[in-house]
């Protein structure tokens, strides 16, 4: 029973949260250079593909080789945009210690648009592919709009005048939470 009291004490919980925060900061310190290196490598790949494309163009390469180089360049540029969106999500996780739904949806939209561009560009699509991607894009877009609308409503609600009753309820809830943490 003494162990249970110790691990549920306020001091122990604060210590554990502090250890967790230090661990997350350590991981962030390790991950940020890796993220930067990944972006630099992606940029280098794009420049290499661009050089390859220009080389094929200037030396009058076979149309098939020229087409492959161009498709590879487009694919890697679109991959770079997806990487940027995913890195924005990761940086937000490090900065705010939470995943923002809005940014996940933005990354999903960028990924779906990338896939649509690639299948249309490579002429390997069917009616059902486009219908499926269209439905997915519509769902992601509606979710994004609804999230934005609900956030605006939340802001309006937060900045309104608080009644005396609401203020006293908030104060009593704060006191109740403090009491629970002390136990």
UniProtKB/Swiss-Prot annotation:
Q: Does the keyword rRNA-binding apply?
A: no
* Alphabetical UniProt keywords: Cell membrane, Membrane, Transmembrane, Transmembrane helix
By what name is this protein known? Uncharacterized protein aq_2087
This chain's source organism reads Aquifex aeolicus (strain VF5)
Lineage: superkingdom: Bacteria
Q: What is its main location?
A: membrane
Question: Which GO terms of the cellular component aspect does the record hold?
Answer: plasma membrane
Localization in the cell: Cell membrane
């Amino acid at each position: 029973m003494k162990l249970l009291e110790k691990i549920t004490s306020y001091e122990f919980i604060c210590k554990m949260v502090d250890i967790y925060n230090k661990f997350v900061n350590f991981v962030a310190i390790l991950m940020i250079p890796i993220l930067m290196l990944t972006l630099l490598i992606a940029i280098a790949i794009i420049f290499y593909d661009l050089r390859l494309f220009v080389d094929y163009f200037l030396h009058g390469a076979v149309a098939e080789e020229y087409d492959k180089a161009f498709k590879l360049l487009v694919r890697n540029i679109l991959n770079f945009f997806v990487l940027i969106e995913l890195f924005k999500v990761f940086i937000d996780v490090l900065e705010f210690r939470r995943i923002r739904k809005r940014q996940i949806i933005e990354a999903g939209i960028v990924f779906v648009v990338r896939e649509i561009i690639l299948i249309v560009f490579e002429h390997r699509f069917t009616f059902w592919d486009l219908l499926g991607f269209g439905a997915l894009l519509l769902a992601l877009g509606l979710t994004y709009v609804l999230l934005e609308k609900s956030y605006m409503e939340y802001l309006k609600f937060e900045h309104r005048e608080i009644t005396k009753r609401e203020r006293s309820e908030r104060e009593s809830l704060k006191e109740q939470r403090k009491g629970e943490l002390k136990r």
